[in-house]
Curated annotation (Swiss-Prot):
Belongs to the short-chain dehydrogenases/reductases (SDR) family. Homotetramer. Residues 1-30 form the signal peptide. This is Dehydrogenase/reductase SDR family member 11. Pathway: Steroid biosynthesis; estrogen biosynthesis. It comes from Homo sapiens. Inhibited by flavonoids including apigenin, luteolin, genistein, kaempferol and quercetin and also by carbenoxolone, zearalenone, glycyrrhetinic, curcumin and flufenamic acid.
């Protein structure tokens, strides 16, 4: 059953980046449940193909379309938007979810690790935002929505050295979202911009950050009742379901037991 306020999105197209697992997969599923066509992209699409089959067998009214895309490569991103334009008209909702962290500190981290984080967390998000807006503009879509999955690390810096460069990229997302909101107003459009900033979410994120210390990664999720990816997906649905005159800039959400 469609959530109140979500009826207007039925059969329209949403792009979800980083849809192969965690928050991205949960968001893609939630949108398909609400009757949207969802292009879910990632570098590998096996998990997205499985999720698409699950959604179909469950009888959800929407459709999940897997698309292989390396978001660190601008040509891949542009090719994806071109394919969406030719096959599905264009993007009405853009969920910039893809993000990564590398354990590269400011004093001794590798430049390649910093570039990996910057390329995906900042540049890919910005390229997808630009292309999504242009897709909406060329079709006279005036009610689109761009949602950036940010982080509480975009609002405070933890005393944890392996997160400091990552946090800088997320502060950039905070600034980019507000800058986007201002530019959309200057363009006199009703397209909205929102970022959602979760705290600790139980995904594979900590295991990738602490890839050489799986016990430390596991402890991240064992010390409290964490958010689930579905909690963040619920926030996405809430944002999309709000009336057109309401602009939600940022949702900050933590586990109740999270201190920082």
């Amino acid at each position: 059953m469609a959530r109140p306020g979500m009826e207007r999105w039925r059969d329209r197209l949403a792009l979800v980046t980083g849809a192969s697992g965690g928050i991205g997969a949960a968001v893609a599923r939630a949108l398909v449940q609400q009757g949207l066509k969802v292009v879910g992209c990632a570098r590998t699409v096996g998990n997205i193909e499985e999720l698409a089959a699950e959604c179909k067998s469950a009888g959800y009214p929407g459709t999940l379309i897997p698309y292989r895309c390396d978001l660190s490569n601008e040509e891949d991103i542009l090719s994806m938007f071109s394919a969406i334009r030719s096959q599905h008209s264009g993007v009405d909702i853009c969920i910039n979810n893809a993000g990564l962290a590398r354990p590269d500190t400011l004093l001794s981290g590798s430049t390649s690790g910093w570039k990996d984080m910057f390329n995906v967390n900042v540049l890919a998000l910005s390229i997808c935002t630009r292309e999504a807006y242009q897709s909406m503009k060329e079709r006279n879509v005036d009610d689109g929505h761009i949602i950036n999955i940010n982080s509480m690390s975009g609002h405070r810096v933890l005393p944890l050295s392996v997160t400091h460069f990552y946090s800088a990229t997320k502060y950039a997302v905070t600034a980019l979202t507000e800058g986007l909101r201002q530019e959309l107003r200057e363009a006199q459009t009703h397209i909205r911009a929102t970022c959602i900033s979760p705290g600790v979410v139980e995904t594979q994120f900590a295991f990738k950050l602490h890839d050489k210390d799986p016990e430390k990664a596991a402890a991240t999720y064992e010390q409290m009742k964490c958010l689930k990816p579905e909690d963040v997906a619920e926030a996405v649905i809430y944002v999309l379901s709000t009336p057109a005159h309401i602009q939600i800039g940022d949702i900050q959400m933590r586990p109740t037991e999270q201190v920082t």
